[in-house]
């Protein structure tokens, strides 16, 4: 797996979670942190301008409405190391490790907003996701449709409950994917 000149970009949600209760660090964020530590890359979080509610059913209602409307929620990029310009970091990198949870067999809409907002020509994207039974669903194909000019690698999937509760299993899964 490519790791030189890489950035780990991810979307993750905190609060009440479907399978693991109340969480302070999102499932996908936990996997992103493991990947970043294994390859020595910085992280950048996709943060929606309108945050999802902490209450699970309220977050589901908001996400369902966004998906039904084909919404493209506004977002900001937040660098894990506090860098001032994470967008410039993405412009200068060759490989993007892209993480997201699976919501109804798809990526959350802010991830689509992010993907559609950039020129991906010449970049390599390595997708990874957390889920509770859907695997990657059809998200790798969706990414390939959106990121014209990029190479999209096979993705890695991990159950959110594993990411949240079993660091050793998460590290093994990441190491197996990175090769």
Where are these regions (language model features)?
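Solvent-exposed loop/turn segments at secondary-structure junctions
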Residues: 13-16, 49-51, 102-106, 131-135, ...
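Residues at alpha-helix caps and immediate loop-helix transition turns in enzyme cores, especially N-
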Residues: 107-111, 136-139, 166
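Glycine-rich phosphate/pyrophosphate-binding loop and the adjoining helix
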Residues: 151-179
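N-terminal beta1-alpha1-beta2 submodule of the flavodoxin-like/Rossmannoid cofactor-binding fold
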Residues: 1-95, 105, 112, 116, ...
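Glycine-rich, charge-decorated loop segments at or immediately adjacent to ligand/cofactor-binding or catalytic sites
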Residues: 133-146
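A short helix->loop->beta-strand "cap" motif at the edges of active sites that frequently abuts
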Residues: 121-124, 149-150
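Thiol-based oxidoreductase modules, predominantly thioredoxin-like and allied folds used
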Residues: 128
